[in-house]
Amino acid sequence: MSVATSDMSGAGPEQAKAVLIAGPTASGKSALALRLAEARGGVVINTDSMQVYRDLRVLTARPTPDEEARAPHRLYGTVDAAQNFSAGAWLDAAAGALAEARRAGAMPIFIGGSGLYFKALTRGLSAVPPIAPEVREAVRERLARDGVAALHAELARCDSEAAARLNVADRSRVARALEVIIATGKPQAAWHAEALPPLLPPSEVLAAVFLAPQREALYARIDARFATMLAEGALDEVAALRARQLDPLLPAMKAHGVPALIRHLDGALSLDEAAAIGCADTRHYAKRQFTWFRHQLPEFCWVAPEEAGNYLGDVIPGRERSERARNP
């Protein structure tokens, strides 16, 4: 993996800096990013792990062709569903999009809900290579069978530093550390020492916001949006994926709604049952997004969606700080 150096030539001090818009699914991020891009001559750069897939425009709520025509959009629908697109691959692509925006003198606007992408963007990315699925599966099976204490004891024998650092009850991190040492032969600390630097250090971020709607309103919006997706062709998208007989472990095949709708197409669920599962999965994911950003990226400013336009209009200097950058 090689991350290109972003070129800041041709960009003024404001345009060279980026705006980051994160938030749970269905919180209004795309609409806000589009208004800001129109007001400031910005480029909208996808920071969502599912919206990279070209096969799922409807089911992942990618911007419509009309919306994409109103302002430049990058990294949307560029990857085939058969590809396992990693955070490292996204970071490479994001570096190119950032350099392109800066050469054009346009404000880079990173928008999405994938916390790992934002963390890689602003904190850097671990150099740990992808762990083979069979190694991960074997460790998870042992975790379920033998318990976390047994895995922690094994970790202490092969990576004592990680074992000393991790709580014996932390199932996910203990399993991850053991996966790394088994798959690569190197402890986590050695890989962390080789981590890539952030693409956007704090000095190059103009504003970073997390849209935080009221939970009940968000959940209602998620349910309504899933119904709209079905009306606009989401089932046809999933049918096309199903016909390709792709590996069900691929990221695109695990997008919210895809597994349940495939079960419907297989005759195992009614459409209403599949939709209910898709909505529930999406609501659970939104809940995890709140928790993840709160603990992993506390530097993001949490704002209500209806106040986000005003907030960005206040924190972004310049004459373009106008009603167009605000909520209508």
Swiss-Prot record:
Residues 48-51 are annotated as: Interaction with substrate tRNA. Its cofactor is Mg(2+). Keywords: ATP-binding, Magnesium, Nucleotide-binding, Transferase, tRNA processing. GO terms for biological process: tRNA modification. ATP binds at residues 23-30. Gene3D superfamilies: 1.10.20.140, P-loop containing nucleotide triphosphate hydrolases. Its EC number is 2.5.1.75. It catalyses: adenosine(37) in tRNA + dimethylallyl diphosphate = N(6)-dimethylallyladenosine(37) in tRNA + diphosphate. InterPro entries: Dimethylallyltransferase, IPT, P-loop_NTPase. The keyword Transmembrane helix does not apply. The record marks 114, 136 as: Interaction with substrate tRNA. Substrate binds at residues 25-30. The keyword DNA-binding does not apply. One of its GO terms (molecular function) is ATP binding. PANTHER family: TRNA DIMETHYLALLYLTRANSFERASE. Monomer. Catalyzes the transfer of a dimethylallyl group onto the adenine at position 37 in tRNAs that read codons beginning with uridine, leading to the formation of N6-(dimethylallyl)adenosine (i(6)A). Belongs to the IPP transferase family. HAMAP family: IPP_trans. This is tRNA dimethylallyltransferase.
